[in-house]
Amino acid sequence: MATAEVLNIGRKLYEGKTKEVYELLDSPGRVLLQSKDQITAGNAARKNHLEGKAAISNKITSCIFQLLQEAGIKTAFTKKCGETAFIAPQCEMIPIEWVCRRIATGSFLKRNPGVKEGYRFYPPKVEMFFKDDANNDPQWSEEQLIAAKFCFAGLVIGQTEVDIMSHATQAIFEILEKSWLPQNCTLVDMKIEFGVDVTTKEIVLADVIDNDSWRLWPSGDRSQQKDKQSYRDLKEVTPEGLQMVKKNFEWVADRVELLLKSNSQCRVVVLMGSTSDLGHCEKIKKACGNFGIPCELRVTSAHKGPDETLRIKAEYEGDGIPTVFVAVAGRSNGLGPVMSGNTAYPVISCPPITADWGAQDVWSSLRLPSGIGCSTILSPEGSAQFAAQIFGLNNHLVWAKLRASKLNTWISLKQADKKIRECNL
């Protein structure tokens, strides 16, 4: 039986309404976030002890942060530690709650009279609120946040940092929204916080994402809400009311682990005309691995052994696993068009173009007879990405990696631009 980890816990760094943060003496740059058995509403104007809430909240946060980390979102989460706590990189918190909304409800309707409940935002609407309990967390504009000239862990919060947090908020919401859909749950809105990692000086998703952080409606039906709004809506807090709230929280905790899996299988099969193309194919396989997609390599020639090519095709069609075929053949590419003409599965041609005859060879992948729907992508990484986009339509884990990759590319460009501008000053 595994021995429970013994932590050398230091001083309390912070205490909030529902959690405490402690330093870890043996792990500089790491902290312990300990959840409480407490539920609050209205900036703690209403608060109650709720036995078991700490474990529920910790489970939800740990699963959600794991999901986001595996997708590629930078997150202040190291690992779950016991039932009610987790270890995370130490951050200096930015005192802004970022809210992302798909459906208009709650406080948005009060602040925007005339908007009807249920109005849908395309894209999701991002708002920010300054954390100030005494003033009920007032809504802030982008300009107010920049004018505040906050500095955390040596990082000044300017236009670049605000843009990064805004884009990250939308991406995180969309990943979680997509992840809840297979459970027939609508993510209505969500609030998150960011911090600056004291070690890396990077902005990361921090704090927690638990059942206090969102509105979650099974079947898109508000009357079935399973989030903290069920506690806010209690006219009077009674033991029976708290038990109902706890059951709602347990309902979410029971399902959140399912977000880490997908019921939709996927597979890429790379067909190469010759082992001389193996290096090209290995790049495709590696890129597929980055999206969590299993990839198999096979050798077959549609010119020299069409019967074997079609036998291999039938082998993969016969096991019921959704498959994208990638054909890798230089010179005269018969492999991609022959496969495409004989299967209803998607086929991508990814010819290894060479400098000498490449300009001529590529036409065998581009000029095709009618009835052939074979796409052509020259980049090995690009062909894997296109396969991922096909699978991402029905696999939220693949889609999450694609969405996080898009965000991270945008952030890297934004940071590169900031660095260049600073060099020019």
UniProtKB/Swiss-Prot annotation:
SMART domains cross-referenced by the UniProt entry: AIRC
Key word Nucleotide-binding present: yes
The keyword Repeat is assigned to this record: no
GO cellular component, one term: cytoplasm
Sites of Phosphotyrosine modification: Y22
Coiled-coil region list: none
N6-acetyllysine found at: K36, K247
Record PTM Phosphoserine, positions in chain: S27, S107, S274
Region ranges (Linker): 261-266
Stretch list, region SAICAR synthetase domain: 2-260
Region of interest (AIR carboxylase domain), residue spans: 267-425
Superkingdom of source: Eukaryota
Residues recorded as bearing Phosphothreonine in the entry: T238
GO BP, sorted A to Z: 'de novo' AMP biosynthetic process; 'de novo' IMP biosynthetic process; 'de novo' XMP biosynthetic process; G1/S transition of mitotic cell cycle; GMP biosynthetic process; purine nucleobase biosynthetic process
GO molecular function terms attached to this record: ATP binding; identical protein binding; phosphoribosylaminoimidazole carboxylase activity; phosphoribosylaminoimidazolesuccinocarboxamide synthase activity
InterPro entries in the record: PurE_classII (IPR033626), PurE_dom (IPR000031), SAICAR_synt/ADE2_N (IPR028923), SAICAR_synthetase (IPR050089), SAICAR_synthetase_CS (IPR018236)
Function per UniProt: Bifunctional phosphoribosylaminoimidazole carboxylase and phosphoribosylaminoimidazole succinocarboxamide synthetase catalyzing two reactions of the de novo purine biosynthetic pathway.
Quaternary data: Homooctamer.
HAMAP family noted in UniProt: PurE_classII, SAICAR_synth
Name of the protein: Bifunctional phosphoribosylaminoimidazole carboxylase/phosphoribosylaminoimidazole succinocarboxamide synthetase
The species this protein was found in: Rattus norvegicus (Rat)
